[in-house]
């Protein structure tokens, strides 16, 4: 089941992204799908949900390229999340299982908002709220480190 990390921002998995009862009850207006392989719910338009795809693959053979692709999207994605939350639009961020790709974006957003804390401190905060988080240190750690450095400038 998806978890609300901060007011209006949820992390979940592919099942949550297709659960219309959950989407309606939490008033989700934006779904950010951090996968290449999972289709959006067909009723999104009828439910008034905006769908955004962040095409990050589950194939980690070329993880250096994946890190760069993800890192270069962080700023725009964080600004978008911030804008939509300020418009009181609830957001579900998901990947396949909710453990790595989606959690990475949530971590990047929390880093964007809580600039005084480093990524390790924010990861611990995220982990207390969402025990499913399993950041694959070999896959997105470089992107998170770069993002951490950029935010400190």
Give short role names for the model-derived ranges.
Residues 89-107:
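A phosphate-binding catalytic loop at a beta-strand-loop-alpha-helix junction
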Residues 2-91, 111-151:
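Cysteine-based protein phosphatase catalytic domain of the PTP/DSP
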């Amino acid at each position: 089941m998806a978890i609300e990390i901060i007011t209006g921002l949820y992390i979940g998995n592919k099942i949550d992204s297709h659960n219309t009862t959950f989407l309606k009850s939490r008033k989700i207006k934006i779904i950010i799908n951090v996968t290449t392989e999972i289709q959006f719910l067909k009723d999104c338009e009828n439910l008034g949900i905006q769908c955004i795809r962040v095409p990050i693959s589950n194939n980690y053979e070329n993880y250096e390229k994946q890190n760069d692709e993800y890192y270069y999207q962080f700023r725009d994605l964080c600004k978008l999340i911030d804008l939509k939350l300020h418009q009181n639009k609830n957001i579900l961020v998901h990947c396949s299982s909710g453990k790595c790709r989606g959690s990475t974006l949530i971590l990047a957003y929390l880093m964007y908002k809580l600039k005084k804390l480093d990524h390790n401190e924010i990861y611990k905060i995220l982990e207390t709220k969402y025990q499913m988080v399993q950041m694959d240190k070999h896959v997105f750690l470089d992107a998170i480190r770069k993002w951490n450095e950029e935010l400190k400038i």
